[in-house]
Amino acid sequence: AEALGWKVDKFEQQMKPIVTSVDRKSPYGFAKAGDVAGVNMTGQGYVDGAAKIDMIHPQQIEPELEGTHTGDYIVLKGSPAVSMAINPEVDGGIGTIAMIVNMIPHVINARPGLRTMLDLPVPRAIMGDFRDYIEK
């Protein structure tokens, strides 16, 4: 919101269980039919009383066992409008690790103190020697 020049005046968050209708087994856990297999997290950011940011973030084990095909979907309403789908989704752990590793030189180069992503360069893949990106 800050990068868009918006001031969020209210934030709402919802968390609802995802109950499975089939048995689900993964390397990380088991949920039998009727049990909770995950959580559907949603959140809205309001600007001038209108929901300008709407996030839907379900997390569950083995969703495909119930016929749910996951992906990352981004919709920007504007001029021009943007609608993007990434299927299959980028594994959250891998995506997070990639972001953290590629930001290491930028964090080292940052001024001391608490920083946000707005204070650092735009994230990108660094394919070379990280030492070449660290200021002396």
Enumerate the predicted regions with their spans.
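C-terminal helical cap and adjacent loop that interface with cofactors, partners, or active-site loops
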Residues: 61-136
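Active-site-lining helix/loop region of Rossmann-like oxidoreductase modules
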Residues: 1-72
